Amino acid sequence: MGIRAIVVDTAGTTTDLTFIQDVLFPYSVKALPDFLAQNQHNVLVENCICDTRDIALEPDANLARVTEILQQWVHEDRKATPLKTLQGLIWKQGYAHGEFTGHIFPDFIEAVNRFSAQKLRIYSFSSGSVEAQKLLFSHSDGGDLTEMFSGHFDTRTGNKLDKQAYANILNTISLSPKQVLFVSDVVEELKAAEAAGMMTCQMVRDSKQRTGDYRTINSFDELVID
């Protein structure tokens, strides 16, 4: 049957975690107050504000309090969908203004071209919004990589630690589990993907990283799909 699609995690796998933690997250924290104040009547932003109040169980929170909650979630690395949606919108402005480019490991840039030439489908699955993923790959250090991807998945598909999320991906891309390889640096994500029947491979870019009972690679250069 063989592998026909590769699903990749982003932070720690295709992009350096420090880029997320030291560049993107602080940028969103700093930009949130003005962004919300200027865009609070935009339908999408308004929905995110309402969802934040609901999740925080603070239905009467004013805009300043909502901003405070969202900034705290960033510091806690919460995977809340309204936060991730707002971060995607904020980062879009940052990329457009040339504040930063998307860090992508060079070995993945080479590999994504190789996989595409092999007619393999490539997907990304991240706790960051689909919009944020598209921005990362379209404004990458290696240029616009988006045409290499067949699709992207985020928290709307499910929690990355939940087997059902991977079952949902399989249903969406219409492939059997053994035709799909999931690559991530996080053991718990690999465990969930394996429970859904997917093939798995752990990316280990840091010698101090916790590993599990999975095939491991240190670079996409080592990932050969026959």
UniProtKB/Swiss-Prot annotation:
Its EC number is 3.1.3.77. The keyword Magnesium applies. It catalyses: 5-methylsulfanyl-2,3-dioxopentyl phosphate + H2O = 1,2-dihydroxy-5-(methylsulfanyl)pent-1-en-3-one + phosphate. Keywords: Amino-acid biosynthesis, Hydrolase, Magnesium, Metal-binding, Methionine biosynthesis. It is an enzyme of class 3 (hydrolase). Its cofactor is Mg(2+). GO terms for biological process: L-methionine salvage from methylthioadenosine. One of its GO terms (molecular function) is 2,3-diketo-5-methylthiopentyl-1-phosphate enolase activity. Binds 1 Mg(2+) ion per subunit. Pathway: Amino-acid biosynthesis; L-methionine biosynthesis via salvage pathway; L-methionine from S-methyl-5-thio-alpha-D-ribose 1-phosphate: step 3/6; Amino-acid biosynthesis; L-methionine biosynthesis via salvage pathway; L-methionine from S-methyl-5-thio-alpha-D-ribose 1-phosphate: step 4/6. Gene3D superfamilies: 1.10.720.60, HAD superfamily/HAD-like (3.40.50.1000). InterPro entries: Enolase-ppase_E1 (IPR023943), HAD-like_sf (IPR036412), HAD-SF_hydro_IA (IPR006439), HAD_sf (IPR023214). PANTHER family: ENOLASE-PHOSPHATASE E1. Monomer. Bifunctional enzyme that catalyzes the enolization of 2,3-diketo-5-methylthiopentyl-1-phosphate (DK-MTP-1-P) into the intermediate 2-hydroxy-3-keto-5-methylthiopentenyl-1-phosphate (HK-MTPenyl-1-P), which is then dephosphorylated to form the acireductone 1,2-dihydroxy-3-keto-5-methylthiopentene (DHK-MTPene). Belongs to the HAD-like hydrolase superfamily. MasA/MtnC family. This is Enolase-phosphatase E1. The gene is mtnC.
